[in-house]
Amino acid sequence: MYRLKCDVKSYGWGKVGHESLAAKLAEAGYGFEVDPNTPYAELWMGSHPSGPSFVMQTGKPLSELLTPETVGEKVYKKYGKQLPFLFKVLSINKVLSIQAHPDKPLGKQLHKTNPKEYKDDNHKPEMAVALTEFDALCGFRPVKQIEQFLDSIAPLREFVGEEAVRQFKGTVKQDERKALETLFNELMHKDEKRIQEFTPQLVQLAKSDANNFGGTEYGGKAFSDLIIHLNSQFPDDIGLFVTPFLNYVRLHPGEAVFLRALDPHAYVSGNIIECMAASDNVIRLGFTPKFKDIETLVNNLTYQTADAKSQLTQPVPFAKACGSGKTLLYDPPIEEFSILQTKVSPGQKQCIRGINGPSILLVTEGSGILNGDKGDVASISPGFVYFISANFPLTISATSEPVVVYQAFCEI
C-alpha cells in the first residue's frame, strides 16, 4: 500500500475555502494550502494525465507504480500503465453544466476532430455516492411526466412551441424515443431572444404557484424552488427549460446513482464520492460559461426514459469482507470500476480479502490503522489516500472514533 498526494481542482462551481470538503480532505491528508477565497470543486485520485496522483514516499507519478504485479495481469494487459478508473470527491456549491459523456465510439471521434475540448478518446460512465444530501438532475423523465409538465407549465409549452408539442403527443405512442428526440431538438435550437422572453414567465409561475407548479404528482414546491434556484445561478439559460425534461433526485448519505454514457445529467448541490472510467470528456449544453456542443449532444443522446429510482444503485454486502465492521459494494454494470464503503467502530476490525485488481482507498471520517498481511502498517485519518496493490489483503481498525473509508477498484 502506497500513500498518495492527489490533485485538487478549482472550478467556479466548487465550494469556497474550508466550506469545500475536497479542499479540507486534501489539507488534512497531505497539507494542501487552502485559500479562503478560492472555490475548490474536486479532489482527483488516480493516474489521469490531467490530474495525476503522486506517491508520497518517492514523489513519482502513480502511473510509474503500475505494473502487472501491482494492478494484476488482466488489468495491466488491457489498460497498461493507466488506471481504468478516476476516483474523485466533489464539493458542489453551484449547479454543474447539464452534460453527457461520450460512449467509446463517440469519444474516439471527438478526440480526433476536437482534441482541444475532448482531451482523451475514452467513454465516461460514472457513479456518484452521496456523502451529504445531494441534489441532481439525471436522465430523461418518463414520457408521462414530461407530458404533464408540458400540459401544466404554460411558459414551457409555449417556449417549445404549441405545434411541436402537438406533434410530440401525436407520435410518442408509436415511437417514444424518436418523438422525444424531435421535441428536444426543437427545444435546444431556440434562440437567445426567445429564452430571454420566456424565462421571466417560467420563473414567475414557479413563484406565484409554487405548490402546484408542474402538478402536485411530479412537481410542486420542491420543483418550483429548484427552478428559482437555478435561475438565480444562471439567469436566462436554456438549461432552465431542459430541467423539466430530466429526473430531479435528492440523495441521502450512502445513496448512489449510476449515469451511463450519453445520458444527460447535472449535479446541483452537495458533497459526493464519484468514480468514472478514466476520462475527462464532457459534452455540455447548458448552465455553463464553457464550450457548449449542442449539435453533438442532441444528435447522440440515448433518449431513453426512466424514473429516478431505476437509476439508483443499491449497495450489497461485499463477499470478500469479514469482521465486525460493515462493507458495502456499489457495483455498476461496467468493468472499469466498483466502489466499497467500509464502516468500522472503535474496537472493531474489518478485513478486505485481496481484490484481483488495483484499488484506491480514501478515508473520509475517523482515525485508525491499516494492516497488510505481510506486516505492513499505516495510520489512517480523514484525507489519507492509499493505492492498494492487487491481491493485497487489508485489515481496517478504528481507534478512538468510527472510521469510514471508500475504496474504488477494478477487477476483470
From Swiss-Prot:
Organism of origin: Schizosaccharomyces pombe (strain 972 / ATCC 24843)
Recorded name of the encoding gene: pmi40
Catalytic residues in the record: R284
Annotated localization: Cytoplasm; Nucleus
Protein name, entry field: Mannose-6-phosphate isomerase
Binding site residues for Zn(2+): Q99, H101, E126, H265
Reaction(s) catalysed by this chain's protein: D-mannose 6-phosphate = D-fructose 6-phosphate
EC number per UniProt: 5.3.1.8
One Pfam family from the record: PMI_typeI_cat
Free-text comment on the cofactor: Binds 1 zinc ion per subunit.
